[in-house]
Each structure stands twice: as C-alpha cells, then as structure tokens.
Amino acid sequence: MSIQIQGVSKQYGTFQALTDIHLDIPKGELVALLGPSGSGKTTLLRIIAGLEEADGGSISFDGEDLTDIHVKNRQVGFVFQHYALFKHMNVFENVAFGLKVRKKSLRPSAEAIEEKVTELLKLVKMDGFAKRYPAQLSGGQRQRIALARALAVEPKILLLDEPFGALDAKVRKELRRWLRKLHDEFQITSVFVTHDQEEALDVADRIVVMNEGCIEQMGTPEEVYENPASPFVYDFLGNVNLFHGRVHKGKLNVGSVELEAPEHKHVSNVDGIAYVRPHDLSISHTKQSIDAIPAKVSYSHAVGNIVYVELKRDGTDEYLEAEITKEQFKQLNIQAGDFVYVQPKEVKVFIPEDFVI
C-alpha cells in the first residue's frame, strides 16, 4: 500500500512541529525518517498512524483520503521504542492479542490464531519462547516480539518509532539487518523513525532527512550521503571538515590553496565553505598537488582497522580530522608534531545564505 502525504502541518502552541510536508511513499518501500530531536519525524509518523491530527493537509493510503479516519480503521501496525509489551501476558498471548480483541465476526478461530502466532514466532526467530514472559527476555528479544505482534494483524503499513533506540550497539546492528531481511520477505510498506545516521543508511530504501519541521532532502542512502542538498544534510550524515574561503569563478580560495568548485563557476568573489568528509582527506609527507593543504599532526588513535588523525592547519587555529587505514598509517609512519600535507579528494562547496556555521 502506498502513502501520500500532502501539505501536512502541525503546531503545538507556538511551536511549529511540521510545515507543509509533501511526501509520496511507494508500495513496499522501507523509508527512514531521519533527523535530530525536534525535527518533526515522530510527529509525522504519528500523523500517518492516526495517533495525532494534522492542522492542515491530508494523509492518503493508495489514493484514499484517511485524514479523518480513526487509527483503529487504518490497518497500521505500530512498533514503539520501548516495546510496550503486556507484562502479565506471555509471549504467545502478547503476539495473539490483536487477533483476540477483534470483533467476534472478524476474529479468527483459536486454531487459526495458534497457527498464525506460531508462524510469526518462527519468522522472528523466537519459536520456543511462547511461554516466557517479557521480564524473562532480553531487549532485542522483546523488540522482536513487539514486531511479531504488530505483524499478527496483517497491517497494510508498518510504522516503527526508533525501534532499536533502547538497545546496545551490537544488538541494534544485528536487529536492523534482520529487519531489512524481514522487510524483503514481507514487502510491506514500512516507515521508521531514527536519529541514527548509520541505521538509516544501512536499512532504508529511501531516506527522508528532516530538520525543524521541514524535509531537507529525500533520496536513496547513496544519494543523500554522496550528494547532500544542504550543509545541514552534509553535517548531519557524518563528520565533516570545513574550509572557509572565497569563491570566485569555480574555485574556492582557502589561504594560499585553491579548491575546485565547478558548480559555482558563475560566482564572483563571495564567501564559501568547502565540506570534506574525514575519509576523503589523504595525507602525504610531500606536496602532491596544488590543492594540498599544509598541516601538523596533533593526535591519532585507532578504532579497529581505522586510524583517526587530528591535524592543525598551518598558520590557522583550525583543526581537521582524517580517516585512514592502519596499513596507510604504518606506511606514512607519522606521529604528533610531524608536518604533512592533506589533500581533499571529494569536495562540496556551499555559499552561506540562510545558514550559520
């Protein structure tokens, strides 16, 4: 089932939570609403579900306007961050709950419910846990049960509000891969809220980046990461180095160094900022090209196979961070105090207008 969001706005007192949101989600797509706290992502999810009313605009499923339809009639499955399992019910009873409380005319038989719950517990790798209670389960196991319960009623749309936010990093990584695989099997239109950039990039078919109640950018994980539409998106989707300078006819002058800015070839002598991710900075002992920037090594530390190198730009108070492999670090044989050159490999230049760095 596809979702159409047209001109949705929401205000709480003087706080504008959402402003004129337009979004189309195709059938079977897994979409991440990504943004910082207060960006409006959870409010939008709750409006899609029918748990909140929009001040303006419409919500449609498969072209049918459901704006004024109650949540219980929207055929939506909802998974919360904190599981919301019934503590007094065992796993089987939790998963079966939505089926058992249906109107008598719509309620499956006891045999059908048992078959459905057994099938779902196998699907979420929790068969054998039917008689256990939530207190006897780990956080990851509880979230699997919460998802099985949401799927039991065969929703047309699955909505997840930071489903892995309360779990530790290793469990989060395992569960998001599992969710991706589960989605590929079910092909149910799904929308999940997250503030975790890695989670969105790893799981989603498409990412909707939100900020201050507006959509900053929509696209595939590769599109939003490789081609950020704004400084906010660039900064929010990972660490970044900033180079302040002047843009003139396709080049950004940073001190004595020129960085290419072909997208601004018609611009003359204005302030500009180059954005470069740490893994797009290479380090060498000698100046390899005219856009190499002199710097001094301040500090380095390894995390797994990656070494993070902090550098201070020569003649400035600005610091840079580069990410290189352990093998590259060994070959360079650099240490704190060494004078080196850093060269940006991928650069995106923005001209400040309505944003502040």
Swiss-Prot record:
Annotated ABC transporter domain residues: 3-237
Major localization listed first in the record, in broad terms: membrane
One term under GO cellular component: ATP-binding cassette (ABC) transporter complex
Family annotation (PROSITE patterns): ABC_TRANSPORTER_1, ABC_TRANSPORTER_2, CYSA
Positions of ATP binding: 35-42
Membrane topology: Peripheral membrane protein
Catalytic activity: sulfate(out) + ATP + H2O = sulfate(in) + ADP + phosphate + H(+); thiosulfate(out) + ATP + H2O = thiosulfate(in) + ADP + phosphate + H(+)
Gene3D superfamilies: P-loop containing nucleotide triphosphate hydrolases
GO molecular function terms noted in the UniProt entry: ABC-type sulfate transporter activity; ABC-type thiosulfate transporter activity; ATP binding; ATP hydrolysis activity
EC number in record: 7.3.2.3
InterPro entries per UniProt: AAA+_ATPase, ABC_SmlMolc_Importer, ABC_transporter-like_ATP-bd, ABC_transporter-like_CS, CysA_C, Mo/tungstate-bd_C_term_dom, P-loop_NTPase, Sulph_transpt1
Entry keyword Signal: no
Localization terms from the record: Cell membrane
Function: Part of the ABC transporter complex CysAWTP involved in sulfate/thiosulfate import. Responsible for energy coupling to the transport system.
Family named by the database record: Belongs to the ABC transporter superfamily. Sulfate/tungstate importer (TC 3.A.1.6) family.
PANTHER family named among the record's database cross-references: SPERMIDINE/PUTRESCINE IMPORT ATP-BINDING PROTEIN POTA (PTHR42781), SPERMIDINE_PUTRESCINE IMPORT ATP-BINDING PROTEIN POTA (PTHR42781:SF4)
Protein name, as recorded: Sulfate/thiosulfate import ATP-binding protein CysA
Species this chain originates from: Bacillus cereus (strain ATCC 14579 / DSM 31 / CCUG 7414 / JCM 2152 / NBRC 15305 / NCIMB 9373 / NCTC 2599 / NRRL B-3711)
UniProt lineage: Bacteria, Bacillati, Bacillota, Bacilli, Bacillales
